[in-house]
């Protein structure tokens, strides 16, 4: 009996001692946390996460670019999104040493930065120094699309992307080039035949799958994870642009062939119309941008851009498309204040809305609103004299950026499908006689407006 009691007592003492030891460890841990802050490590003075491969690669890249006065800025979507969500914390961290690596130490393959090429003064020297610092770098180039319209310069090549690897982490440096519409453009990252396709997992890159266009961002300096760097002043605005940045060029080669086959109209009247149409489009683009209303080139204006990289001189108007969900009631007032009075308003927001504004010297701005169905999109038309309604069907499309008459504007990415819906397979042949009620292959009758609604749906000014 006494032996059993001794065993019980021994077990109880062991259990009590273990519990007390665990309590001491728990207390010690929380005492240190309270004393040194929530981001402290077990060894006083160490910083959590700063030994990661990712952070060391970014630090070395920042040291490299700073020493060479290369004004790079962070564009990595994942990190910018994290910064944007914790912006106050990042601003506060800029005032003192970082105790924990919260952004650049997260495991990933790449970190993306960008620079504006016209600010880069020593590209070749930078490349050599990067390799001396231990980076393995790959550079991609391509012909400068800004010179495609100039035969003698069309072969000039410009840098598009650098991918610099340090051990297992890579820095993707996207080279932005200025375009005449006062925006920034980057090219497609296309590997040439001799390049190592296993250099990094290229498919995981967040930029370079296609060319992209961005508004020129205002930048600010911050300290992130102990590293000083530039980021967009409005990270949220930049992040909104990323998934919608795809850019397609005007087809200069095909346009030259078209203008050789169909001699361009260079009469005084044609040149005056092009000038006025360009001014009208620039004014419309500014007005809609100020309203935050996205639009795209539609109908004859879209055809002119795609077929001949210019304005069709016999079209006599400028055509734009807007998704009906982007309609804002103050559109009419905004155009009137911009000096474009309303010429007519057909339809209503719920059905077949169309607005037309009078520009200078009889150049008209037509805005067609597009409605979405299960498998197609459509815009409406109204005959003022009879009240007849028409519907123009289009396959669904997405929007890409392009440059047209020195403006960054949207066009349907699926441009050929869009144009063929409106003009048929023979869109390459100029047609000067056009009946909007019967010529388009995608038009169909859509009923008639009740006379009781005419005052609302047929407004002429």
Curated annotation (Swiss-Prot):
Q: Does the keyword section mention Phosphoprotein?
A: no
Reaction(s) this enzyme catalyzes, per UniProt: 3-O-[beta-D-GalNAc-(1->3)-beta-D-GlcNAc-(1->4)-(O-6-P-alpha-D-Man)]-Thr-[protein] + CDP-L-ribitol = 3-O-[Rib-ol-P-3-beta-D-GalNAc-(1->3)-beta-D-GlcNAc-(1->4)-(O-6-P-alpha-D-Man)]-Thr-[protein] + CMP + H(+)
Glycosylation site residues: 92
Pathway stated in the Swiss-Prot or TrEMBL entry: Protein modification; protein glycosylation
Could you give one GO CC term from the UniProt record?
cis-Golgi network
Q: Provide the phenotype resulting from gene inactivation.
A: Embryonic lethality. However, when human FCMD disease-causing retrotransposon is introduced into the mouse fukutin gene, alpha-dystroglycan/DAG1 is hypoglycosylated in muscles as is seen in FCMD (congenital muscular dystrophy Fukuyama) patients. Transfer of normal fukutin gene into these knockin mice restores glycosylation of alpha-dystroglycan. Conditional knockout in muscle results in near absence of glycosylated dystroglycan within 18 days of gene deletion.
Looking up InterPro entries in the UniProt record yields: FKTN-rel, FKTN_N, LicD/FKTN/FKRP_NTP_transf
Q: Which GO terms describe its molecular function?
A: phosphotransferase activity, for other substituted phosphate groups
E.C. no: 2.7.8.-
Where does this protein chiefly localize? Golgi
Q: Which residues lie on this side of the membrane: Lumenal?
A: 29-461
Its annotated compartments are:
Golgi apparatus membrane; Cytoplasm; Nucleus; Endoplasmic reticulum
Going by the UniProt record, its keywords in alphabetical order are: Cytoplasm, Endoplasmic reticulum, Glycoprotein, Golgi apparatus, Membrane, Nucleus, Signal-anchor, Transferase, Transmembrane, Transmembrane helix
Q: How does it sit in the membrane?
A: Single-pass type II membrane protein
> Which residue windows are transmembrane per the record?
8-28
What the protein does comes down to: Catalyzes the transfer of CDP-ribitol to the distal N-acetylgalactosamine of the phosphorylated O-mannosyl trisaccharide (N-acetylgalactosamine-beta-3-N-acetylglucosamine-beta-4-(phosphate-6-)mannose), a carbohydrate structure present in alpha-dystroglycan (DAG1). This constitutes the first step in the formation of the ribitol 5-phosphate tandem repeat which links the phosphorylated O-mannosyl trisaccharide to the ligand binding moiety composed of repeats of 3-xylosyl-alpha-1,3-glucuronic acid-beta-1. Required for normal location of POMGNT1 in Golgi membranes, and for normal POMGNT1 activity.
Which PANTHER family does the annotation name? Answer: FUKUTIN-RELATED, RIBITOL-5-PHOSPHATE TRANSFERASE FKTN
Assembly and oligomerization = Forms a complex composed of FKTN/fukutin, FKRP and RXYLT1/TMEM5. Interacts (via transmembrane domain) with POMGNT1; the interaction is direct and is required for normal POMGNT1 location in Golgi membranes.
Its family remark reads:
Belongs to the LicD transferase family.
Q: What is this protein identified as?
A: Ribitol-5-phosphate transferase FKTN
Task: Name its species.
Answer: Mus musculus
Its gene name is: Fktn
């Amino acid at each position: 009996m006494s032996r059993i009691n001794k065993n019980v007592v021994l077990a109880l003492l062991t259990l009590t001692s273990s519990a007390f030891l665990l309590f001491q460890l728990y207390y010690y841990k929380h005492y240190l946390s309270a004393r040194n802050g929530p981001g402290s490590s077990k060894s006083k003075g160490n910083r959590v996460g700063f030994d990661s491969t990712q952070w060391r690669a970014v630090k070395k890249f920042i040291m490299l670019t700073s020493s060479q006065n290369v004004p790079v800025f962070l564009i990595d979507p994942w990190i910018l999104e994290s910064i944007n969500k914790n912006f106050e914390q990042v601003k506060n961290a800029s005032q003192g040493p970082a105790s924990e690596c919260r952004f650049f130490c997260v495991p990933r393959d790449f970190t993306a930065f960008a620079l504006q090429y016209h600010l880069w003064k020593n590209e070749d020297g930078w490349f050599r120094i990067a390799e001396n610092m231990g980076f393995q770098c790959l550079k991609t180039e391509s012909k400068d699309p800004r010179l495609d319209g100039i035969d003698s310069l069309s072969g000039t090549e410009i840098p598009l992307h650098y991918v610099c690897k340090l051990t297992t982490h890579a820095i993707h440096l996207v080279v932005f080039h200025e375009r005449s519409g006062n925006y920034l453009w980057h090219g497609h990252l296309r590997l040439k035949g001799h390049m190592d396709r296993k250099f990094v997992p290229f498919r995981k890159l967040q930029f370079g799958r296609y060319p992209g266009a961005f508004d020129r961002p205002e930048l600010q300096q911050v300290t992130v994870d102990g590293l000083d760097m530039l980021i967009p002043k409005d990270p949220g605005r930049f992040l909104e642009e990323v998934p919608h940045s795809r850019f397609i060029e005007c087809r200069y080669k095909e346009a030259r062939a078209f203008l050789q086959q169909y001699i361009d109209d260079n009469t005084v009247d044609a040149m005056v119309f092009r000038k006025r149409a360009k001014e009208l489009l620039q004014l419309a683009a500014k007005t809609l941008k100020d309203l935050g209303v996205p639009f795209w080139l539609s109908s004859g204006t879209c055809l002119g851009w795609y077929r001949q990289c210019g304005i069709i001189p016999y079209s006599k108007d400028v055509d734009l498309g807007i998704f009906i969900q982007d309609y804002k009631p103050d559109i009419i007032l905004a155009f009137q204040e911009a000096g474009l009075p309303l010429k007519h308003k057909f339809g209503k927001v719920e059905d077949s809305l169309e607005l037309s504004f009078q520009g200078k010297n009889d150049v008209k701005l037509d805005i067609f609103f597009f409605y979405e169905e299960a498998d197609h999109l459509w815009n409406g038309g109204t005959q003022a004299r009879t009240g007849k309604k028409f519907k123009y069907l289009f396959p669904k499309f997405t929007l890409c950026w392009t440059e047209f008459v020195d403006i960054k504007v949207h066009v349907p990415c699926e441009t050929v499908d869009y144009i063929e819906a409106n003009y048929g397979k023979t869109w390459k042949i100029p047609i000067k006689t056009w009946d909007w009620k019967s010529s388009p292959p995608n038009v169909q009758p859509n009923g008639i407006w009740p006379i009781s609604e005419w005052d609302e749906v047929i407004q002429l000014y």
